[in-house]
Curated annotation (Swiss-Prot):
Membrane topology: Single-pass type I membrane protein
PROSITE patterns (UniProt xref): EGF_1, EGF_2, I_EGF_1, I_EGF_2, VWFA
Annotated gene: Itgbn
Function noted in UniProt: Contributes to endodermal integrity and adhesion between the midgut epithelium and the surrounding visceral muscle. Essential for migration of the primordial midgut cells and for maintaining, but not establishing, cell polarity in the midgut epithelium. Can only partially compensate for the loss of beta-PS integrin during primordial midgut cell migration. The two beta subunits mediate midgut migration by distinct mechanisms: beta-PS requires rhea/Talin and beta-nu does not.
GO biological process terms on file: apoptotic cell clearance; cell adhesion mediated by integrin; cell migration; cell-cell adhesion; cell-matrix adhesion; heterophilic cell-cell adhesion via plasma membrane cell adhesion molecules; integrin-mediated signaling pathway; melanotic encapsulation of foreign target
Organism annotation: Drosophila melanogaster
Record's subunit section: Heterodimer of an alpha and a beta subunit. Interacts with scb/alpha-PS3.
Tissue: Expression is confined to the developing midgut endoderm and its precursors during embryogenesis. In the larvae, expression is concentrated in the midgut imaginal disks. Expressed in embryonic and larval hemocytes (at protein level).
Cytoplasmic side, ranges: 747-799
Protein name: Integrin beta-nu
Length: 799
């Protein structure tokens, strides 16, 4: 009995709790609704807000939830509310390509949407890459003098090219065209126009801009023959007219033979840079490229001297519009320039390095084609007042839905689901309420059409009738009925326009004061006139500065941008897609997601698409820690190590796709090896032991541009020491040291002797000589007198 009683109590408690939560939610909705002062603002405040147009409705708030309006006796037929609708009209199942029928790669194909302003409708869109889908591959080749070996290689690889394409799809066609540059000064010397190879002491074809050699065909021998019969030409500068030629390949649909349902690919092969829009001025060509086909019957581009080169934007838009992908197969010397170009149109372009003689072109075609079919991206033509956001987990590549309209590394035959959020941000200025929107795959003629109907603004606001007799009667003939409320004539106010704006005619002061009190509220201000924040003037609150609302119950929104937010009782309620205290941030954190997949490296917050880093972190993604290693340096280190080892002949990097691609296995990072990095750039260090067993320090820098990663690497290969030379150096060094020591010793001795001799001479100069007074010379001297002197020649003893 006790157990049964406990269970009963528990059930009663749960029912009470659910009812309390539901009541709380309803009150929350009503709080958002009740401050809307017009039908349109009411329906925009919340999806469940409704407006009462009942003439007999007595409650002050006409904008509440449908349930609350019915509770306050608003007639059900006079309630105008939001009514969103989603209905799928065509939903063919996904299927692969068959010769008797076309493939279906997108489902559903058509749907109906009724949109409510400020409300989001979510619908599911599925995509699956079809097997054996048709491929149209057009080879556009630079045939200037430096590409002569590449032409010969392509000619020899014709049969192998056929087999390569068969391995990719069983339904393919090939076309061929060539280009050089505009045949005029300064692109070519006039005297060399007929033979631009004269400087090389050779003969070649006169310079031309673009020549269409072979329309798309499944005849491989015809393709090989077209390549073989094409002639080498030349130009003066190192810039080519590739964009001129590419524009013609794109827009000359009939001449090239593009098939609408095929995957259309242009592979542009060159070893030079491109002329861009404006370069034509150098040749006196001022007319802008008209994006029209100008091929004569021989396939020659006749507008080369009439129209400037196209811009990258013009090329990009035409590629998108006609669903054509472009592969830039370029040499290593110019690849960095094409990486930057491809980053501007990454969803429809691919760049890879071409070997010096184009011998790797088959591998390049296979690799780039597989990369293209592994990527799917959707775009739409929605007007600016309708927002469309895409969410997907890319077939399980992410643990949760990510805000993105593309997926990489899509497996052939695997279904990818996208969830499309469609939101009506505002009503169109032209008051057109039916629209057609196409959501299409950017590389294929696969799409979903949306028939969109916009829920019109409140109908009662569209046809005001100031002269309606019944409406004027209800408004005391001093106004007219407008959406269930009296719109008073000048000089009158009040619920029924029975209060003159001249205060001297007030008949019932207490009745007018009552109109300045909130009709129902749980707040303590319900008995206060104008919430104690204003004065009651003829039944209408005149609010003090800083307050607003019918009863001055709300603070003003000082920082709300009216274009981005609505002010509801002192709070900025951001419109769809905007956030922040001032609603000036679009709420998209995609720009703050670094290569590691983390928002601001988990060291900051994303505000207005920029990382606001915590102290002491720095960098675009807060990846730099002044006291520790750079987080992105560590992220890229395995990839760079692998690339350096591969370049230095230490083996093939087998897991390159895994460690050198983004988290969703996007195409391998573009990279470039240089002899020396810019010392002004912040460099990352990678330390590895080379094949000689020597530890070497190499350096690299990374660039992240619109989620595309670029690596520039300075690989240092430390060579082993030359022992013979080392012994020679040591011996020579030892000999030099010995000679130096001997020289120093000799110099020291000589210097010492010189000092002592100088001292001796100085002492000699300063010495004084005199005899000692007590000194007696031991030698006596006697002098014989002259008288006793004898001549030596006389004999004194002679007689």
């Amino acid at each position: 009995m006790t157990s049964l009683g406990g269970r009963a109590f528990l059930w009663i408690y749960l029912v009470f709790l659910i009812a309390e939560i539901s009541h709380s939610d309803a009150d929350s909705i009503d709080d958002q609704c009740r401050h809307a002062d017009s039908c349109e603002r009411c329906l925009s405040a919340h999806l469940e807000c409704a407006w009462c147009t009942d003439k007999e409705y007595q409650v002050g708030y006409r904008c509440l939830s449908r349930r609350q309006l019915l509770n306050y006796n608003c007639s059900e037929t006079d309630i105008y509310e939001n009514q969103p609708v989603l209905d799928v009209l065509q939903d063919k199942p996904l299927k692969d390509y068959e010769t008797s029928d076309q493939a279906v790669q997108v489902t559903p194909q058509r749907a109906y949407l009724k949109l409510v302003k400020g409300n989001t409708q979510r619908m599911k869109l599925s995509y699956r890459t079809a097997r054996n889908n048709p491929l149209d591959l057009y080879v556009l080749m630079d045939l200037t003098w430096t590409m002569r070996d590449d032409k010969k290689t392509l000619e020899e690889l014709g049969a192998q090219l056929s087999q390569t394409l068969k391995n990719l799809t069983g339904n393919y066609r090939l076309g061929f065209g060539s280009f050089a540059d505009k045949p005029t000064l300064p692109m070519i010397l006039p005297q060399h126009r007929e033979n631009p190879c004269a400087a090389e002491r050779a003969t070649c074809e006169p310079t031309y801009g673009y020549r269409h050699q072979l329309s798309l065909t499944d005849d491989i021998p015809a393709f090989t023959s077209a390549v073989a019969n094409s002639k080498i030409t030349g130009n003066l500068d190192n810039l080519e007219g590739g964009l001129d030629a590419l524009m013609q390949v794109i827009v000359c649909t009939k001449e090239i033979g593009w098939k609408e349902q095929a995957r259309k690919v242009v592979i542009l092969v060159t070893d030079g840079f491109m002329h861009l829009a404006g370069d034509g001025l150098l040749a006196g060509i001022i007319q802008r490229n008209d994006k029209q086909c100008h091929l004569n019957k021989a396939g020659e581009y006749t507008g080369s001297l009439n129209y400037d080169y196209p811009s990258l934007e013009e090329i990009y838009r035409e590629l998108l519009r006609r669903k054509i992908n472009v592969i830039f197969a370029v040499t290593e010397e110019v690849v960095s320039s094409y990486w930057e170009l491809s980053a501007l149109m990454k969803e429809i372009s691919y760049v890879d390095i071409l070997s010096a003689d184009s011998s790797n072109i088959l591998e390049l075609i296979k690799k780039s084609y597989e990369s293209l079919i592994k990527r799917t991206q959707f775009a739409d033509n929605s007007p600016d007042f309708i927002d469309m956001a895409y969410y997907t987990d890319c077939g399980g590549q992410f643990p949760s839905l990510q805000k993105r309209n593309y997926c990489n590394n899509v497996t052939l035959g695997k279904q990818i689901d996208f969830y499309v959020d469609v939101t009506l941000k505002k009503y169109p200025d032209n008051q057109v309420y039916t629209h057609k929107i196409r959501v299409e795959e950017t590389s294929l003629s696969e799409f979903m059409d949306l028939d969109v109907e916009l829920q019109r603004p409140c109908p009662c606001q569209e046809t005001p009738d100031p002269e309606n007799e019944e409406g004027r009667f209800l408004c005391d003939y001093k106004g007219y009925l407008y959406c269930g409320m009296c719109e008073c004539d000048e000089g009158w106010t009040g619920t029924y326009c029975n209060c003159p704006t001249d205060a001297t005619n007030v008949t019932s002061n207490e009745a007018l004061l009552q109109k300045c009190r909130q009709p129902f509220s749980d707040k303590s201000t319900s008995e206060l006139v104008c919430s104690n924040h204003g004065d009651c003037d003829c039944g209408t609150c005149l609010c003090d500065p800083g307050y607003t609302g019918p009863f001055c119950e709300c603070r003003e929104c000082l920082d709300c941008d009216e274009k981005l937010a609505d002010c509801f009782c002192g709070q900025c309620v951001c419109k769809y897609g905007w956030s922040g205290s001032k609603c000036n941030c679009d709420g998209d954190t995609d720009a703050c997601v670094g290569p590691t997949g983390e928002i601001c490296s988990e060291r900051g917050t994303c505000q207005c698409e920029e990382c606001q880093c915590e102290e002491p972190y720095l960098g675009k993604f807060c990846e730099i820690d002044p006291e520790k290693d750079n987080k992105l340096c560590l992220f890229y280190e395995p990839c760079v190590t692998c690339l350096i080892e591969q370049k230095q002949g230490m083996g093939v990097c087998e897991n390159l796709t895994e460690i050198c691609s983004s988290l969703d296995r996007q195409e391998t990072y573009p990279y470039n090896f240089v002899h020396e990095l810019d010392p002004e750039q912040d460099q990352c260090l990678v330390r590895l032991v080379n094949k000689h067993g020597i530890q070497c320090d190499s350096f690299f820098v990374y660039q992240v541009i619109d989620h595309s990663n670029f690596l520039t690497i300075q690989a240092v290969d430390c060579e082993p020491p030359d022992y013979v030379a080392l012994v020679g150096y040591i011996s020579a060094f030892t000999l030099l040291i010995g000679l130096l020591i001997i020289f120093i010793i000799l110099w020291y001795i000589r210097a010492k002797d010189a000092r002592e001799y100088a001292k001796f001479e100085e002492d000699q100069k300063n010495s004084v000589r005199q005899e000692n007074p007590i000194y007696r010379d031991p030698v006596g001297r006697y002098e014989v007198p002259k008288a006793l002197s004898v001549k030596y020649d006389e004999n004194p003893f002679a007689s």
